[in-house]
C-alpha cells in the first residue's frame, strides 16, 4: 500500500510514557506521529507474516520428513529383498 492510498482515521490509546517516547523520536527524525505509527504497524504486520510463513514452512518440512522416512524405509526393504534375490540367484538356490 502506497502512502498516497486511501486512509482510515483511527483513535488509539497509548500509555503517556510511550507517547512521550514517540514524540521524542518524531522530533529527532522530523516526522509526524502518524508516520511513525504507520511505519511501526507496517513493520509489525510484516514481522508477523514472516513468522507465520516460517511456521508453515517448519510444519511442512516436518511433514515431509515423515514422508521421506517412510519412502526411505520402503526403499531399504526393497533393496534388501533385491540383494537376497541376487544372492539366491548367484548361488544357484
Curated annotation (Swiss-Prot):
Antitoxin component of a type II toxin-antitoxin (TA) system. Antitoxin that directly inhibits activity of EndoA in vitro. Upon expression in E.coli counteracts inhibitory effect of endoribonuclease EndoA. The EndoA-EndoAI complex does not seem to bind its own promoter. It comes from Bacillus subtilis (strain 168). InterPro entries: Arc_rbn_hlx_hlx (IPR013321), CopG (IPR002145), Ribbon_hlx_hlx (IPR010985). GO terms for biological process: regulation of DNA-templated transcription. GO terms for molecular function: identical protein binding. Belongs to the MazE/EndoAI family. Keywords: Toxin-antitoxin system. Gene3D superfamilies: Met repressor-like. Pfam families: RHH_1. Homodimer, forms a heterohexamer composed of alternating toxin and antitoxin homodimers which inhibits the toxin's endoribonuclease activity. Antitoxin prevents RNA binding to the endoribonuclease. Disulfide bonds: none annotated. It comes from the Bacteria. This is Antitoxin EndoAI.
Amino acid at each position: 500500500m502506497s502512502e498516497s492510498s486511501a486512509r482510515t482515521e483511527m483513535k488509539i490509546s497509548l500509555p503517556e510514557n510511550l507517547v512521550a517516547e514517540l514524540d521524542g523520536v518524531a522530533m529527532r527524525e522530523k516526522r509526524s506521529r502518524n508516520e511513525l505509527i504507520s511505519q511501526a504497524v507496517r513493520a509489525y504486520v510484516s514481522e508477523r507474516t514472516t513468522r507465520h510463513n516460517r511456521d508453515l514452512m517448519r510444519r511442512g518440512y516436518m511433514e515431509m520428513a515423515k514422508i521421506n522416512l517412510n519412502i526411505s524405509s520402503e526403499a531399504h526393504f526393497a533393496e534388501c529383498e533385491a540383494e537376497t534375490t541376487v544372492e539366491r540367484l548367484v548361488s544357484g538356490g
